[in-house]
A protein has these predicted regions:
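Generic detector of short alpha-helix boundary/capping microenvironments
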Residues: 15, 46-47, 136
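Short, structured coil/loop segments at alpha-helix boundaries
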Residues: 4, 63, 67, 119-126, ...
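Short hydrophobic/aromatic beta-strand micro-patches
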Residues: 59, 104-107
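Bacterial N-terminal signal peptides that target proteins for export
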Residues: 2-14
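An amphipathic, aromatic/His-enriched active-site/gating alpha helix that lines ligand/cofactor pockets
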Residues: 28-33, 110-138
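Core hydrophobic alpha-helical transmembrane segments of single-pass membrane proteins
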Residues: 14-20
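Short S/T/G/P-rich N-terminal loop/turn motif that feeds into the first structured element of a domain
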Residues: 8-9, 20-100, 114, 140-170
Length: 170
């Protein structure tokens, strides 16, 4: 008789666990926005007279079987950001148990973005990680300096309009 009373609780717990497991692949997790030119208390701290900054966003769908070099080089790029001239901050996001990854970096100006894109660390990451890319979207836009960072909802709305680049056919 004692077991008959615990069975409904076990079933309810099992159902809750299954429901949670079914939802997790749709969940996204992001890092807090941080960087050498940003304070969560005061906003952008990098000295500049311009009222706008440049936001660069990448959204990648990855081949899980070829993902290890992509992830390793992404870490190296993140570690290099603090030393990049004009870098304000960044956030990363990924889908739990999924194959999607996003990056948002914010820069003083276009010249700083271009210098970063030409950096040896970024160029090596592109070469090493490209094999894992299935599809990607890239977006670059100006953003008010006093409103950094944009929300991920704002970023998603802009990415919605961006074209896909299909790497499976390259």
């Amino acid at each position: 008789m004692r077991y008959a009373r615990t069975l409904p609780w076990i079933s309810a717990g099992l159902l809750a666990a299954l429901a949670t497991a079914a939802l997790l692949p749709g969940c996204q997790i992001s890092t807090n926005f941080r960087g050498p030119g940003y304070s969560s208390d005061t906003g952008v701290t990098l000295e500049d007279d311009d009222d706008e900054v440049v936001v660069v966003v990448t959204y990648a769908q990855l081949d899980n079987t070829r993902r290890a070099p992509f992830d390793a080089h992404s870490e190296l790029v993140v570690q290099s950001l603090a030393a990049q001239p004009g870098h304000i901050g960044y956030s990363r996001r990924k889908r739990l148990f999924g194959t999607e990854a996003w990056t948002m970096t914010i820069w003083r100006d276009e010249a700083a973005v271009e210098e970063f894109l030409r950096s040896p660390t970024h160029r090596a990451a592109i070469r090493a990680g490209q094999g894992a890319l299935e599809r990607a979207k890239f977006e670059r836009f100006s953003w008010p300096r006093n409103a950094v960072p944009p929300s991920w909802e704002e970023v998603d709305a802009r990415l919605e309009r961006a074209p896909w680049l299909d790497y499976r056919t390259r």
